[in-house]
Amino acid sequence: MAEQSTTLPPFLTASVLGFSGVKHGYFTRKGGVSWGREDLNCGLGADDDPADVNENRCRVAQAMGAAKLVSLYQVHSADVVTLTQAPDWHRGPQADALVTNVPGLCLGALSADCGAVLAADPVAGVIASAHSGWKGTSLNIVRSTLDAMERLGARRERIVVGLGPMIRQESYEVGPDF
């Protein structure tokens, strides 16, 4: 069983989201209980002790003031799941973005080198998280996410978007398949 702790993991924030009053964070590998380089592993499909992953997810949710971290089984798509109530799943469906108007939900997008995109319309109370790698970006995952937010009452001109840390072109080779 994973060691329980009140230690909360550190996280980064995007000024634009902070100024709008949206509670959010981009978490690093630090502050979890898993072994190895990725001690804050929150991936349910990872080769890690499920009890450790659950504890890590609880720590992230607690740091955000929520009861549970909600995430998806990410597949590098443009598919968006809209939540109008708190889900009861343990492992979410295959998609790459979550949108909700339910207060208190902690939406997560897991990333390493891909982009974690957080968006909010603070007036409408609509938030979103998206996992945007090169494939999802080329499939317009962000546009699909904003469209889903609008269907819940968000207005494009009020939506603020924060981009999390991600890999840059200088850090890897891009082949002719792009």
Regions inferred by a protein language model and the residue ranges of each:
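Active-site microenvironment for binding and transforming phosphate-containing groups
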Residues: 1-178
